[in-house]
């Protein structure tokens, strides 16, 4: 369902120093969604980045250029971390300055194949603290938002995570990541097997980490884990999950490190710890060391 003008008005209201930034992010996410929906049905020029499974299209670049250029006009002193700029050699460093963390199309492989699970993700951090996140599920026109201390919403409806604590009653989401060498695939499949041996109801892969995390925030899944995601996949969704009452931690069980390329998220701390304890680590390095 497309957000109504009334709902959009509700979403941009708030009391805080970053209200204008949040409002602009919402409008840009909606504009980006229009571009992505139109391009979804068209022919695409596809390139690869780190592997044959790590894809990029002209639309990724077009959407990122739109978002970054508009934000630079409005907020010239702010910093940016954006997926395609980073792939082209820009440094991925989170400082204390106001910083936008952008994934123009999360689910590019889905986008290429016209599989309708595709999103644009815009996160915002100040003093290395995540302030808000905006994620637009382009094909279903669902707008997920979260602001620190102000709750999380989808098209104006408040989100609430699942309160499940029993892994044997859990639906768990994950993503494969771009590395497909035999050792990485062996550990990936082993981690799924461990959760299934623990009698989890199921393990799902949908091709978009940001939307999987939004489904967790909505209570449609109980946990999420991944090795190989990046800060632009995680920033906006982390705020949304936390504001929906959920937990986001490192796969070691410690506090989340946005640059570590790994995460466990769940509706409850008990569930997050159970997942973290079951996992074998896959090393993807760090975003701020690439």
From Swiss-Prot:
Phosphatase that can use myo-inositol monophosphates, myo-inositol 1,4-diphosphate, scyllo-inositol-1,4-diphosphate, glucose-1-phosphate, beta-glycerophosphate and 2'-AMP as substrates in vitro. No physiological substrates has been described yet. Has been implicated as the pharmacological target for lithium Li(+) action in brain. Belongs to the inositol monophosphatase superfamily. The gene is Impa2. GO terms for molecular function: glucose-1-phosphatase activity; glycerol-2-phosphatase activity; inositol monophosphate 1-phosphatase activity; inositol monophosphate 3-phosphatase activity; inositol monophosphate 4-phosphatase activity; metal ion binding; protein homodimerization activity. This is Inositol monophosphatase 2. Its cofactor is Mg(2+). Homodimer. Mg(2+) 2 binds at residues 103, 106, 233. Keywords: Cytoplasm, Hydrolase, Lithium, Magnesium, Metal-binding. Its main location: cytoplasm. GO terms for biological process: inositol biosynthetic process; inositol metabolic process; phosphatidylinositol phosphate biosynthetic process; response to lithium ion. GO terms for cellular component: cytoplasm.
């Amino acid at each position: 369902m497309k957000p109504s003008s009334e709902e959009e008005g509700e979403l941009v209201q708030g009391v805080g120093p970053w209200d204008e930034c949040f409002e602009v992010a919402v409008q840009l996410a909606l504009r980006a969604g229009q571009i992505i929906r139109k391009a979804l049905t068209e022919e695409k020029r596809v390139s690869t980045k780190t592997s044959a499974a790590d894809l990029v299209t002209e639309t990724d670049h077009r959407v990122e250029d739109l978002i970054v250029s508009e934000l630079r006009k409005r907020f010239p002193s702010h910093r940016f971390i954006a997926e395609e700029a980073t792939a082209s050699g820009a440094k991925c460093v989170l400082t204390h300055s106001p910083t936008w963390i952008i994934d123009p199309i999360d689910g590019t492989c889905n986008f290429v194949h016209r599989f309708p699970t595709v999103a644009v993700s815009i996160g915002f951090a100040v003093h290395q603290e995540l302030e808000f996140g905006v994620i637009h599920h382009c094909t279903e026109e669902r707008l997920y938002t979260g602001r620190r201390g102000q709750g999380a919403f989808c098209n104006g409806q408040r989100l609430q995570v699942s309160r499940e604590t029993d892994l044997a009653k859990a639906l768990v989401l994950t993503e494969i990541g771009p590395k497909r060498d035999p050792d990485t695939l062996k550990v990936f499949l082993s981690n799924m097997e461990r959760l299934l041996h623990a009698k989890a109801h199921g393990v799902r892969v949908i091709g978009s980490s940001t939307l999987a995390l939004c489904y967790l925030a909505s209570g449609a899944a109980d946990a999420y884990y991944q090795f190989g995601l990046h800060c632009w996949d995680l920033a906006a969704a982390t705020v949304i999950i936390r504001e929906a009452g959920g937990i986001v931690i490192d796969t070691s069980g410690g506090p989340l490190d946005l640059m570590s390329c790994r995460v466990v998220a769940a509706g409850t701390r008990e569930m997050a710890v159970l997942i973290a304890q079951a996992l074998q680590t896959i090393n993807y390095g760090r975003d701020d060391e690439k």
